[in-house]
Amino acid sequence: MNYTIQRISTEQDIEKCNLFEINNYQWKNVYKPKTYGYAGYLEGKGIYVKFICEESNPKREYTKDRDSVCLDSTVEIFMAFPEKGEKLSNDVMYINFEMNSNGVMYSKYGKGRKGRTFISEELCAKSNCKSVIGEDKWEITVTIPEELLREICDFDSILNGETFYCNFYKIAESPEVEHYGTFSPIENETPNFHLPIYFAQANIEK
């Protein structure tokens, strides 16, 4: 599976980008909300992502960044960046951005699942996560700051077409609304989104 991130000049162009659909529902699912979105590269700013979830009255109890938003109804983007010559594994550098419909983020980076680091408050502000809740759907927009990407990977190589890896998710871990949706399927017996070996190949168009 592959996903190409197109270059855009403004946030308003995001829906001209390639569509991703989160339509693989795995493990336990009380329901399966239709979720999809777009990702584009804004030069000098970062990777801009828009999610649309066709879900009314989404669970949204958490109101502060770094809260455990995965217990709410949440959309997520994970991106993995193996170093040059490094084989893709579950211990490569990757980021996870998780957002509930309050526009609250839980965002970390690091190698592997243990010992991960929260992004700084400054970068969190630059991510400019925004939510819009409608009657029968809700939307999230967020920017993965270029400053962060340059800190954790050789981003110039990425801009020149080097492959990295990504996955998009829809999740709620609370039992009354529990569900687990993926863009690229995860081959694991129990819910676990922190497995880069199952991410889709990705690139930014030159």
Which residue stretches match the model-derived regions?
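Structural preference for beta-rich elements and adjacent junctions enriched in aromatics
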Residues: M1-K206
